[in-house]
Amino acid sequence: MANRKSLIKPTLLRSFYVSVVFFCLFVFIGSVTPAAGADNETIPSYGRGPHEVLIFSDYFCPPCRALEPKLEPVLDALYKQGNVRIRFVDTPMHRETPLFAKFYLYAAKAAPDYRSAMRARQVLFALAGKENVFWMDERVEEAFRKEKVAFTPFDFRTVQPELNGMIRKHRVDSTPTCVILSPGKKALKYTGADGILKGLGSLQ
């Protein structure tokens, strides 16, 4: 399970590190020119059910990559049941993550449906698994075009306040993490593959 303690061990420095990581979200806006009219972007959600499922993950987190093939069929089933709203919250535990998070949101804007979002995540996780690659906008763009993943650039900074706020609100300091929000109930937080799958199973 990836966590910020493994990146900077002294606990007193964790808040400083988090600030630096979120600052990187600005740095990695990249060379693609944003599309006009993207003033009120939000982290997309999929489904209209009463239970909100927040998936906090990092494409460069090995446990997240290992969980993803097991997670997909569970989320698919919940989505088809119609009792959940799913949101993927890319959580920057590695320096390359903001770039990939940006392209996930680009893809979600171009094709705002659940299946397209899952396809974009599949491609991004596969790219993150490649070793010795210096990732930049052009390389992710090339991969998206090759895999026929549509994407629409926009000013990624418009999403950052919501992204940062969700990570802080739910005190997410490791990935993968899942938070389930149900009407009239306390938020339930699960970490690690087994915990997350068990928690999601309670909604089936």
Language model: regions and residue ranges:
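Short active-site neighborhood of thiol/selenol oxidoreductases, capturing the structured segment around
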Residues: 47-60
